[in-house]
Amino acid sequence: MAEKFTQHTGLVVPLDAANVDTDAIIPKQFLQKVTRTGFGAHLFNDWRFLDDKGQQPNPEFVLNYPEYQGASILLARENFGCGSSREHAPWALTDYGFKVVIAPSFADIFYGNSFNNQLLPVTLSDEQVDELFKLVQANPGITFEVDLEAQVVKAGDKTYSFKIDDFRRHCMLNGLDSIGLTLQHEAAISDYERKLPAFMN
């Protein structure tokens, strides 16, 4: 079972860039591991650090600003997560501490991978995202509330509705990944296997 996602209130960091690809999110030299942990240290490595080893923070990159330390909601521009289909991208984002990414659009594979890893991708219109960027930039350190049950983002004095597939919403609300979904039908699977002819077992 994965962690259930119903509602999250968190600090918002504005990444004012479109077409952020998966190689920028987690560069290929850090993909040797097959476990989900440890990737957060290398999130946006080529942007966050001035050296290849990740020891000299880039003071001009937004994630390194003092006011955004501990951010758990990432605000981005269109086509977030484009490029190769590596699942390491949502792994890196969640391992860093992000729970939500808000953008006008997402690459399809990244969008699906995010749900599989309990990272909520929230799609709002370009105009709404523009409003949110202005709000965050005028109020560094602001928090948003993201309510998956009600399907709304509460930011300042405004509330923004977002759409999400019913099945994906159900899975996130109940903390169900592919393994959890399978285990829901464990009894039926066992019953089916018992009925198989012996030579098929």
UniProtKB/Swiss-Prot annotation:
GO biological process terms on file: L-leucine biosynthetic process
Top-rank EC class of the record's enzyme: lyase
GO molecular function: 3-isopropylmalate dehydratase activity
Gene Ontology CC annotations of this record: 3-isopropylmalate dehydratase complex
Record key words, sorted: Amino-acid biosynthesis, Branched-chain amino acid biosynthesis, Leucine biosynthesis, Lyase
Enzyme Commission designation: 4.2.1.33
Domain of life per record: Bacteria
Pathway it works in: Amino-acid biosynthesis; L-leucine biosynthesis; L-leucine from 3-methyl-2-oxobutanoate: step 2/4
The keyword Lipid metabolism appears for this protein: no
Pfam hit, one: Aconitase_C
Catalysis performed (reactions): (2R,3S)-3-isopropylmalate = (2S)-2-isopropylmalate
Family the UniProt entry places it in: Belongs to the LeuD family. LeuD type 1 subfamily.
PANTHER family xref list: 3-ISOPROPYLMALATE DEHYDRATASE SMALL SUBUNIT, 3-ISOPROPYLMALATE DEHYDRATASE SMALL SUBUNIT 2-RELATED-RELATED
Complexes and interactors: Heterodimer of LeuC and LeuD.
Function: Catalyzes the isomerization between 2-isopropylmalate and 3-isopropylmalate, via the formation of 2-isopropylmaleate.
Protein name: 3-isopropylmalate dehydratase small subunit
Taxonomy of the source species: Bacteria, Pseudomonadati, Pseudomonadota, Gammaproteobacteria, Enterobacterales
Gene name for this UniProt entry: leuD
